């Protein structure tokens, strides 16, 4: 697990003077980058191997938004690797240690030279220590279709 502390800045607020969704995502992405850098499998490691992690999915649950000057702790850890995908939880806590935001994310590792997904290297898998999934309601990723729908004419997709 990796954590860091910060203070909510004016530039991170939305019009209601709460931490904006974009800033929450920035904190979480920075946290995962700091984590990877600390483990020696960060940006330079990936670049040398023509690899990149691509965000595939976010689920963010906000119980309470931090406000201007609130002291916060941001944390992250992976909980699973499957094929070319990495599964990672994030959280944000207030200065009392209460978890006010939780998130689930799925990342895809891409090989930039081959132009396709790649499995994490053995070194990457060893560097990250998976922890138990964060307790939260995990939303399904598939969209359920309701009703019968209607038949449409076929068409060809080209370049």
Predicted feature descriptions by range:
Residues 59-95:
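Hydrophobic beta-sheet segments that form the core/acyl-binding groove
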Residues 97-99:
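Residue-level signal for glycine
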């Amino acid at each position: 697990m990796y954590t860091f502390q910060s203070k909510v800045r004016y530039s991170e607020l939305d019009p209601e003077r709460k931490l904006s969704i974009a800033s929450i995502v920035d904190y979480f992405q920075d946290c995962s980058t700091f984590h990877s850098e600390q483990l020696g499998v960060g940006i330079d490691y990936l670049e040398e191997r023509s690899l990149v992690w691509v965000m595939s999915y976010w689920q963010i649950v906000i119980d309470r938004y931090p406000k201007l000057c609130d002291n916060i702790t941001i944390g992250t850890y992976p909980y699973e690797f499957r094929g070319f995908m990495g599964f990672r939880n994030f959280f944000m806590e207030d200065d009392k240690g209460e978890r006010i935001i939780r998130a689930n994310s799925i990342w895809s590792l891409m090989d930039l030279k081959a132009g396709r997904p790649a499995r994490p290297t053995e070194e990457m898998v060893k560097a990250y220590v998976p922890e138990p999934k964060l307790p939260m309601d995990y939303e399904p990723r598939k969209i359920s279709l309701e009703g019968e729908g209607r038949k449409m004419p076929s068409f060809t997709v080209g370049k």
